[in-house]
């Protein structure tokens, strides 16, 4: 009996999980994208063999995606599918990937990363520190001290929210001032604790964490029930605080953008920034060059150089 493309997708996802060691979020996205492709194929004909998938089928599917999704989402879904067929070609399941010599042009408008203004950052930091002093219960105090550690770590290292939530206690070395981060694709990198303020915030939280009874997890950031803190919990707290204090939406990823832009504006080599952010390609980091240029233009406009000679 010949395997259908659904069978090969299942095997590919197993390969991604157990051999490529993709993160849970990436696997979930792959599952959704692959299932969507199967639904499309079934709407056109019966589930078929990968050898029957040709360029016309792929192009028609890409056109279908483009009518329903934003360019960035389309690119992600296409990249997932392209990786799948490349895997089939590598394993000699198909002779050649239908993506070979297939030109897919999806224009994505360039959107500069949103950063946090210095004044807004000061207000947020002041808020989390003040909250820790005004708590009435051990539960409230624990959450407040943990929030301080989260905010300080995000702004001082630029790590992703997923990386923060998956951070292990033994990955932090206070003596050397380093943290080992396992990013996308389980790629390991080092970030640095160069501020005593940040170290103290993390150590204060670590002390409270140790005082919790029956610690049953190696994750550094936990909730009151000793469970790993969820990304949505961090986003929710930050969303509520920023709306209440600033009347705007601040996200954890904006801390990352702010970290990178601040380094660039302080003349840090972009290759160092690439390493700290865990970007596999320098092109991803180069978007901050455009953001820095925008900051330069704003500064020049505010200076009104020519008007000074009128």
Label every model-predicted segment.
Residues 1-310:
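Conserved catalytic core of the tyrosine transesterase superfamily
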């Amino acid at each position: 009996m010949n395997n259908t493309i659904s069978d090969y997708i299942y095997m590919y996802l197993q390969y991604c999980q157990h051999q490529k060691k993709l993160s849970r979020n990436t696997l979930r996205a792959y599952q959704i994208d692959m299932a969507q492709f199967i639904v499309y194929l079934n709407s056109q004909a019966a589930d078929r063999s990968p050898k029957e998938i040709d360029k016309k089928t792929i192009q028609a599917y890409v056109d279908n995606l483009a009518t329903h999704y934003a360019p960035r989402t389309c690119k992600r879904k296409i990249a997932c599918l392209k990786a799948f067929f490349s895997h089939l070609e590598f394993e000699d399941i198909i002779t050649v990937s239908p993506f070979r010599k297939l030109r897919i042009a999806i224009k994505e408008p360039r959107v500069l990363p949103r950063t946090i203004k210095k004044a807004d950052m000061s207000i947020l930091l002041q808020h989390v520190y003040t909250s820790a002093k005004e708590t009435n219960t051990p539960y409230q105090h624990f959450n407040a001290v943990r929030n301080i550690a989260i905010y300080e770590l995000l702004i001082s290292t630029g790590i992703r929210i997923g990386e923060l939530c998956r951070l292990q206690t033994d990955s932090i070395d206070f003596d050397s001032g380093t943290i080992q981060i396992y990013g996308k694709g389980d790629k390991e990198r080092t970030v640095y604790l160069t501020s005593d303020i940040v170290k103290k915030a993390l150590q204060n939280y670590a002390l409270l964490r140790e005082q919790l009874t029956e610690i049953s997890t190696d994750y550094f950031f936990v909730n009151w029930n000793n469970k790993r803190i969820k990304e949505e919990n961090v986003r929710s707290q930050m969303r509520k605080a920023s709306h209440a204090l600033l009347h705007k939406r601040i996200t954890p990823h904006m801390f990352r953008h702010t970290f990178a832009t601040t380094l660039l504006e302080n003349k840090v080599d972009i290759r160092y920034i690439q390493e700290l952010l865990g970007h596999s390609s320098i092109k991803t980091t180069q978007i901050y060059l455009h953001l820095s240029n925008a900051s330069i233009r704003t500064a020049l406009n505010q200076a009104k150089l020519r008007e000074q000679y009128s």
